[in-house]
């Protein structure tokens, strides 16, 4: 089952040397293993969207989607798969 977090939850992210996320802290904590990456850019209505999404496994057991929002310079967890 998928749980979409509304609003998305802000987290602190540690990146590796290649700029991939390797750990998060905040409402969700632990090491993460990135699985997939994609970018979304566009001008939705009156606010531009520039996001880098990652699908990752948190603590070896929880699949989640997180993204970096370049317009506010912040990471968020947006979706978890139970």
Q: PLM features: residue spans?
A:
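Non-catalytic peripheral regions of nucleotide-handling enzymes
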Residues: 1-82
